[in-house]
Amino acid sequence: MKRTFISAFLLGGILAGTHLSAQETKPASALKKGPNVSLNITNKKKFPPRTYVNLGLFSNYSCLNGLGINAISSLQHYNSYGMQISGFTNVSGLKSTGVQISGIANVTGKRACGFILSGLTNVTGTSAYGLSIAGLGNISGGDIKGVGIAGLVNVSEDTRGLAISGLANVNKDIQAGLIIGGLMNVSGNSSRGVQLTSLLNVSGKSNQGWQLAGLGNVSVENKGVQTALLNYSVTNRGVQLGVGNVNTKNSSKGYQIGIVNVSTDSTAHQIGCINLKPQTRVQMLVSGGNANKASLSIRFKNKYTYTQIGTGAYYLGVDNKLSVTGFYRAGVYHSLTD
């Protein structure tokens, strides 16, 4: 009798452990249960239970596989597949695939795929694929692939595709595609494609496409094209087009085209009014003659070429109006002596 009791006890423990282990294999719900004021058509025989039609004021249920329309909010503990529409917020604990439309926010714990539209923000934990449109911002913990349109900001680890924002596009790693920001575009690693903004483009590591800005472009290594009022790169192996172009590392064999070009590499190719390299000799010249009674100029002399900018006066008397001239010269030279 004693042996029978011990055997039954051990068997019950094994069965209980088996039951607990089976429960642990089920995916954990990311959200807590809450009030549900809606009409639902649900299949409870599956885990998690599938809701195929959901109509109500606000809903809180396991999984949507179909159509959900709510006046206030819609919350799924697991996944949402189909169309999810609410007046204020849509929340999916894990993944959403299909259409999400809300007045304030769409929030997905992991990945969102499809068409996502909100009055304020779209938030995804890992990635957003498809078309995301928000009045305020699109925010993704991973990447945005496809099209992201926001009134203020698009923020993600990577962006690949088309990103349009009224204020800024900010990425931790890579921007690839067409990136249009109202004021600035920032990529922590590299930009591949086109960065277009009215103020500033910044690439934390390299620019491998085209940076086009109204004020300035900044990159550690430029392998593409920079076009702005001011362009800066530590290493320039591409083309800089602007009023002022600067690169500060010796291994820069790209092209600088602008008014003022500054490079620490003696082999850099420069086309501009003032070209400065390590071997550039800066000379101040004072002269006079028939054309100018007196003139003062600065000459920037490189290995075979020079540029010169200065000012002078035709007449220095006091009985007539003073005339002032400005001039610029560029040319090539050959030294007659070593």
Give the residues covered by each predicted segment.
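Bacterial Sec-dependent N-terminal signal peptides
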Residues: 1-25
